Amino acid sequence: MSKSQQNNWAQYRPEQTQGGAGEISAIVSGIVSRIQTVTLVRVVKTKSGGLAPVGLVDVQPLVAQISGDGTVTPHGIIYNVPYFRLQGGGNAVIIDPEPGDIGMCGFCSRDISSVKQNKAPSAPQSRRRFDYSDGLYFGGFLNGTPKQYIHFKDGGIKLFSPGDIEMEAANIRLNAQGGVSSTSQTFQANTKTTAKFTGGGGISSDGDVKAKDVSLLDHPHSGVQSGNDQSGKPVAT
């Protein structure tokens, strides 16, 4: 008996080699073993991403294959798997997978090659079913501590990044029932036209305030005369 035949026999339990119900069970098990459902995978490569249409990833299943004689063999790479993005119409949260991420890969019941190309209803290119070639990636499972995040917790929401946070819109409004505060070392507002601050409580400063080149704390006046006359306007120092 050849080694391959020995391996085939090793895949079956003794009761499955004696005919009858055991043989039927072996046949069903063989069919089911060829059906891919979902499995954990690690991202090997990300293609596209950022402010672009949803891209693809190359992934490797984490649960190894076992032959009939017990030999453990790592899975190969599954290429060009579409990944999930939280998106509705033109609105999206862009968090692209990165190499090393662990996620779930689900496998479709039919060949989705044409749909991936056309992004429209299409006929299957083959009769394959539940195949590794028709996977979809959903991240992230079993991953480490994030470095930047949005944390929804009791009492509020925390947005954190060790880098810069940029907001860009036609208009940005901050509506706070209490107040808006900043503990940063500097606060700078550069407007192209008009900067306006209004409020019933007034504006206070622990340091100097300048209007163009005129200091509020230390400025001379033009046209100063003695007596009851008023001085001229403040001038820059």
Protein language model features and the residues they cover:
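Hydrophobic packing positions characteristic
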Residues: 2-178
